[in-house]
């Protein structure tokens, strides 16, 4: 049974690893990463609160005669 010749293996593995490293580096360099979000200025919104009294027909008493 013939012996497996392994003398050329290091000369094949070293360039292969170098090539894989370079390809990986090029892919990482060309990747567009998202920028961190900028802080957003928060504006205070006026929400309608049910406890704020607003005079509408809903609040008028039914027992009183209509006023014009």
Swiss-Prot record:
Keywords: Acetylation, ATP synthesis, CF(0), Hydrogen ion transport, Ion transport, Membrane, Mitochondrion, Transmembrane, Transmembrane helix, Transport. It is found in: Mitochondrion membrane. Disulfide bonds: none annotated. One of its GO terms (molecular function) is proton transmembrane transporter activity. Pfam families: ATP-synt_8. InterPro entries: ATP8_mammal (IPR039017), ATP8_metazoa (IPR001421). The modification N6-acetyllysine is found at residues 54, 57. The chain crosses the membrane at residues 8-24. Its main location: mitochondrion. It is a single-pass membrane protein. The modification N6-succinyllysine is found at residue 54. GO terms for cellular component: mitochondrial membrane; proton-transporting ATP synthase complex. GO terms for biological process: proton motive force-driven ATP synthesis. Coiled coil: none annotated. The keyword Acetylation applies. The keyword Glycoprotein does not apply. It comes from the Eukaryota. Component of the ATP synthase complex composed at least of ATP5F1A/subunit alpha, ATP5F1B/subunit beta, ATP5MC1/subunit c (homooctomer), MT-ATP6/subunit a, MT-ATP8/subunit 8, ATP5ME/subunit e, ATP5MF/subunit f, ATP5MG/subunit g, ATP5MK/subunit k, ATP5MJ/subunit j, ATP5F1C/subunit gamma, ATP5F1D/subunit delta, ATP5F1E/subunit epsilon, ATP5PF/subunit F6, ATP5PB/subunit b, ATP5PD/subunit d, ATP5PO/subunit OSCP. Subunit 8, of the mitochondrial membrane ATP synthase complex (F(1)F(0) ATP synthase or Complex V) that produces ATP from ADP in the presence of a proton gradient across the membrane which is generated by electron transport complexes of the respiratory chain. ATP synthase complex consist of a soluble F(1) head domain - the catalytic core - and a membrane F(1) domain - the membrane proton channel. These two domains are linked by a central stalk rotating inside the F(1) region and a stationary peripheral stalk. Belongs to the ATPase protein 8 family. This is ATP synthase F(0) complex subunit 8.
């Amino acid at each position: 049974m013939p012996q497996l010749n392994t003398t050329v293996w290091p000369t094949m593995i070293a360039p292969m690893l170098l090539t894989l490293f370079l390809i990986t580096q090029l892919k990482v360099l060309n990747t567009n990463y998202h920028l961190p979000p900028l802080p957003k200025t928060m504006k205070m919104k006026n929400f309608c609160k049910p406890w704020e009294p607003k005079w509408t027909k809903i609040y008028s008493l039914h027992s009183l005669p209509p006023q014009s």
